[in-house]
């Protein structure tokens, strides 16, 4: 007789990048508890990351309401279940009142900043062996990625947009990186350019899409759900992008990843994994905070990151991952 299912409520982040960085905990729990069944709560933008988990019951998109009623709505959806484990990476009060055998609730700990992967692992007390980000994909998702990337030559994936102008490296510099790496004398000679971004980025990336002949450009901006983007990124030889959810998807996919940083803290948000690099200009995060304390001004903070520095990092990473 098979064992009874072990229901796990997993409450994760609103933002895509944070949700990706916590995703390895589901893989770890699934490996250690074979009869686990997951209900995942995530922000609407990130919820799609968890749709292909093979042993999930529900994915609940969790949209914040100005009056705070979103917590009561979530309570109504989850309160009747007797949970085996509640993992709450938001540290909410709701989790303390649910019926469960065990709880693992995020608590802020004093001390120096630690990476978000380690912070999530600390909630399960596995910070000495943190769970690397991991996303499940269905055979159908993988096949679509195969079809979208069909062709010959290595793929350079670029994600030139970000959720804020301050974190966005100029589009013309991404174009120069593409030319340097994919040129006949470049380390990815004969390769193809893959461009990724959200629906609002379509016009922004147009200059980049014109960098190479059409038959060497795969512009999927605004066309993919998150898991298909993840599956497509598995097929790239190299990823270069701003600090964004796509950067974390690329690193989780195992693709050699270069994250371009300026006014964001790479101690917390560096791409996770051995085949990743952080590239930033001459200023550290604290210097950006000093001139833009709220990190919300309409200022292009990435102007002092030169193309040559990014290309050099790309060449080094390509050599290291041959």
Model-flagged regions — what are they?
Residues 1-322:
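Catalytic machinery of carbohydrate-active enzymes
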């Amino acid at each position: 007789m098979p064992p009874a299912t072990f229901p796990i409520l997993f409450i994760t982040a609103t933002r895509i990048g944070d949700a990706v960085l916590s995703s390895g905990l589901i893989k770890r729990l699934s490996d250690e508890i074979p009869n686990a069944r997951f209900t995942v709560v995530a922000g609407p933008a990130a919820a799609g990351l968890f749709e292909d988990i093979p042993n999930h019951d529900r994915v609940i998109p969790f949209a914040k309401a100005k009056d705070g009623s979103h917590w009561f709505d979530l309570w109504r959806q989850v309160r009747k279940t007797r949970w085996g484990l509640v993992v709450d990476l938001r540290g909410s009060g709701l989790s303390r009142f649910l019926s469960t055998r065990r709880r693992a609730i995020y608590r802020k700990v004093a001390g120096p900043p630690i990476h978000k992967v380690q912070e999530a692992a600390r909630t399960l007390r596995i910070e000495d062996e943190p769970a690397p980000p991991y996303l499940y994909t269905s055979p159908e998702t993988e096949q679509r990625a195969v079809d979208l990337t069909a062709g010959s030559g290595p793929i350079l994936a670029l994600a030139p947009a970000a959720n804020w102008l301050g974190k966005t490296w100029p589009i013309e510099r991404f174009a120069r990186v593409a030319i340097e790496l994919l040129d006949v004398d470049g380390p990815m000679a004969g390769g193809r350019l893959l461009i990724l971004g959200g629906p609002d980025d379509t016009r922004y990336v147009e200059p980049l899409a014109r960098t190479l002949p059409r038959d060497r450009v795969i512009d999927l901006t605004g066309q993919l759900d998150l898991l298909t983007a993840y599956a497509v990124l598995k097929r790239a030889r190299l990823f270069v992008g701003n600090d964004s959810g796509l950067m974390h998807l690329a690193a989780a996919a195992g693709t050699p990843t270069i994250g371009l940083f300026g006014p964001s803290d790479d101690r917390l948000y560096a791409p996770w994994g051995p085949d990743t690099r952080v590239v930033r200009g001459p200023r550290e995060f604290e210097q950006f905070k000093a001139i833009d304390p709220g990190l919300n001004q309409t200022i292009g903070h990435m102007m002092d990151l030169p193309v040559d520095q990014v290309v050099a990092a790309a060449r080094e990473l390509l050599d290291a991952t041959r």
